[in-house]
Amino acid sequence: MLYRTYNEYKQTLQRLLHDWKIYFGATKADLVKNTCFVSHLSGDTAYADGVPIIASTTYQLIFLQDRQAFTNKRVIELTDDGVKYAGYDPASECNVFTATVTLYGPGSVPDE
């Protein structure tokens, strides 16, 4: 399923990970178990009639959890290339998983 807006995607993540905390950006104090961090990786611009518009935005998702296996199939399906194990983080005492997602159109950037 393609998500055209950041808010749509975040709402879906919140529904599927209802007992997790989800952050856009984070500080070290936010490192707790069952947490998903969303970080901006890149954005592409296109031009329509000489006017720049946001074509797409790519985000990195970082998941912290107790288990060494990420088994939420619905969340895996929401990513560009699946969810990958990155290792164990002794500071947070969590297993770390990463993924990327690309959202399309001007709504791919969150409203501030």
Q: Where do the language-model regions lie?
A:
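Oligomerization/assembly interface segments of phage tail-like spikes and tubes
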Residues: I54-R67, N95-S108
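Short proline/glycine- and acidic-rich turn/helix-capping motifs at secondary-structure junctions
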Residues: K28-L31, P90-T102
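Short, conserved charged micro-motifs
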Residues: Q68-V75
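Compositionally biased, intrinsically disordered linkers/stalks adjacent to structured regions
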Residues: Y9, L13, L17-W20, A99-E112
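Small/polar-rich, solvent-exposed N-terminal microdomains that initiate assembly or binding
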Residues: M1-A46, V51, D66
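Intrinsically disordered, low-complexity acidic/polar segments
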Residues: Y47, F70, S108-E112
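Low-complexity, intrinsically disordered Gly/Pro/Thr-rich segments
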Residues: D80-A91
